[in-house]
């Protein structure tokens, strides 16, 4: 084989790219080049390795692309944060470590589209199990020997977690013991991608640690991919910058784009694959007119409903610098304590109205009052619910702004563009207030800090959402899978109209899933890896799962305030 020639070139060492790199190199006769624009996942850096430090990577640019949106027209024209991971592990290196697979009906909804019939939940479940090692043990829903370590909530954690779950049940919503099991709907403990010794379980740790010593895998960090190289309509390699030096690499079989929902469409467009009118604006030579590239962009928007805590049991003391050395030392030496948890140990999914087919609102409970990125901490004991809608009908786009591979694209999520968005956020605030006023929280609940109890009308709540709602960091769907005119890839990630070119990451989701996106992204990469290998897919299972089928979203005899 010629120098700098490989069977497969993978662009992006994130949640999907690391899965493919690991699985493809299980075959010793297959050579893989894995390119990552960021650096290594330094294991000595507490900012990415300590679960409780999850806000730190979002505050800088070493591990975060720190994109910003265009002014969002329905959000007071705010330019909103769009953090994405940079480094081995991608966004699994900087995310909140919540392991949520989505609802079974998400995948059944994908499979309802012509050509995607093999993406039902029961087709996907074997791949969720394949990827996972859950500390509570394997069962029909969970795996026991996969690369991703998943930890469950343990006795002795902050009492606010149990109180918030109990309050949700007292408000009439279901209790579920496993948000990734038979029934997602309801309130319960949240699984997290954290190792047994309290470290972040990124895909770099889970997948690359298994694969990086293989002689058939070459990993190059600080490699910014400029464009995919083509011979006609066939992808034959990539051009990239390594520490600023131009390098070409050849792919004998395929180029696999795994750069995420922002950078994957950007790379395709820069390479000449996308909407011809957009490319013409920047004099990008057209390889293939594919108008769906960068369209259909989706995300989860969320808000923080915050309360004062009457008892001194919140994480507020952990925010004080004088307490942090002891927390860090316990974590470093023992892998225990506050530092060993992402502190998202409870949450839930609800239907706000009986005619919703599956949950449309997600909750993360946090025993402190602070923004996700560590900003705007309330200077007192407090707690909060992160509340967000799950399947907004609003759609955005990613658009190339320059042929410079270091330039950021134009990003517009078009948040809150549909009347349904406003209804769901108003419902979310009002239902959350009901939950927070339940007896289970009486001993802890102080005054409402945000939005503030004085805000009650639709107009007041809408103003709060415009001013304060933030991204949940779940961009997706911008290179969607399917066979309609706006689809970008087929049911195995192959780019329509092209040869030897795939996209494999969250951008190929036809519709965003109900919950966090790391677990679904790993699953779809595992599933497509088998197809790249030419293997038969894992057999569809017949494991039961909950479908509401008209069941009321909450018990009417519950306490309401």
UniProtKB/Swiss-Prot annotation:
Required co-factor(s) are: FAD
Leader sequence segment: none
What GO CC annotations are associated with the protein? membrane
Question: From its record, what is one biological process in GO terms?
Answer: glycine betaine biosynthetic process from choline
Q: In which pathway does it act?
A: Amine and polyamine biosynthesis; betaine biosynthesis via choline pathway; betaine aldehyde from choline (cytochrome c reductase route): step 1/1
* One Gene Ontology term of the molecular function aspect: betaine-aldehyde dehydrogenase (NAD+) activity
Name the residues annotated as catalytic in the UniProt entry.
Answer: 474
Which residues lie in coiled coils?
none
Looking up Pfam families in the UniProt record yields: GMC_oxred_C, GMC_oxred_N
Catalytic activity reads: choline + A = betaine aldehyde + AH2; betaine aldehyde + NAD(+) + H2O = glycine betaine + NADH + 2 H(+)
Q: What are the binding positions for FAD in this chain? A: 7-36
Q: What is its EC number?
A: 1.1.99.1, 1.2.1.8
The answer to whether keyword Isomerase applies is no
Report the sequence similarity comment from the record.
Answer: Belongs to the GMC oxidoreductase family.
**HAMAP family in the record, alphabetically?**
Choline_dehydrogen (MF_00750)
Q: Which PANTHER family does the annotation name?
A: CHOLINE DEHYDROGENASE, MITOCHONDRIAL, GLUCOSE-METHANOL-CHOLINE GMC OXIDOREDUCTASE
Protein name as annotated: Oxygen-dependent choline dehydrogenase
Source organism (scientific name): Paraburkholderia phytofirmans (strain DSM 17436 / LMG 22146 / PsJN)
**Primary gene name:** betA
